[in-house]
Regions:
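Secretory targeting signatures
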Residues: 100, 181-227
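Structural motif
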Residues: 30-34, 70-74, 115-119, 169-174
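Short loop/turn segments that connect beta-strands within beta-propeller blades
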Residues: 36-40, 75-79, 121-125, 174-178
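Loop/turn-rich, solvent-exposed surfaces of beta-rich toroidal or solenoidal domains
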Residues: 92-124
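Blade-level signature of beta-propeller repeat domains, shared across WD40, Kelch, NHL, RCC1
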Residues: 150-184
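Beta-rich, blade/repeat-based domains predominating
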Residues: 8-19, 48-65, 91-105, 137-157
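Conserved beta-strand positions in repeat-built beta-propeller and related beta-rich domains
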Residues: 24-29, 62-69, 109-113, 162-166
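Conserved small/polar residues in nucleotide/adenosyl-binding loops
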Residues: 1-6
């Protein structure tokens, strides 16, 4: 096992694997590093403007968040921005996009200081659904230094590992969802297809699932109870 101490002038943030390298962001240092995965030596560095929060690789681009509602898609060789999308919920920007995990055309992310994981369409930026693992996170602390802040896809099981700042455990969960029938849609009075989230915990822990559908646009707050 290799252990590398990072430069104390940098606050290390999100990382992702790219081929035989690890790409690591710095929070306010405006630097990203390419690190050899075999020995953790720095082989290249990139400059960027703004803050670095989360990063993942979707097979074509490095996908990066900066704590706003914007997500940038960057060239994996040069780190130059190819294009950006804005994350929205019912047409309203969702700020504080943090940790990212790319799975196919979907981007999973946590929203800083909100106890949720959201699914983002990588083309439109629309939030497709979200889940709130409060039954897990509530056992790990409730202050700003103990928030949900880690998502990793487990290809072998199809599940997701989640954890948070200063958490003592990581948890393997499975997330799936399905659309409701038109009959349910009509009786509920909703004017668009809604989604029911079905989630099961592989480690035999309950995971609270929250479904929310709004008719009136407002600043997104995923801690609100469903209307």
């Amino acid at each position: 096992m290799c252990i590398r101490d990072s430069n104390n002038s940098y606050f290390a943030e999100g990382i992702t694997v790219l081929d035989q390298s690890i790409i690591m962001l710095t929070w306010k240092g405006e630097q990203a590093f390419r690190i050899d995965i075999s020995n953790f030596s720095i082989v290249e560095n990139f400059s960027f403007e703004g803050e670095g929060w989360g990063i993942c690789f979707n097979g074509e681009f490095l996908v990066m968040s900066n704590g706003t509602s914007q997500i940038s898609f960057r060239d994996p060789e040069t780190f130059e921005i190819n294009h950006t999308i804005q994350v929205t919920w019912d047409g309203q920007p969702v700020p504080n996009i943090n940790e990212l995990e790319c799975v196919g055309k979907e981007i999973l992310a946590n929203v800083w200081l909100q106890d949720v994981i959201i699914s983002i369409d990588s083309i439109s930026g629309n939030v497709q659904y979200f889940v709130s693992p409060t039954s897990i996170s509530s056992t790990q602390g409730t202050n700003s230094n103990e928030v949900l802040n880690g998502i990793a896809f487990d290809k072998s099981s199809g599940g997701f590992w989640i954890t948070g700042k200063n958490w003592t455990h990581i948890y393997l969960i499975e997330i799936s969802y399905q659309e409701t029938s038109s009959e349910i849609q009509e009786t509920s009075g909703l004017n668009r297809f809604s989604e029911i989230l079905i989630i099961s915990i592989i480690l035999l822990l309950p995971l609270l699932v929250i479904f929310r559908n709004k008719n009136e646009p407002e600043t997104p707050n995923f801690k609100d109870s469903p209307p």
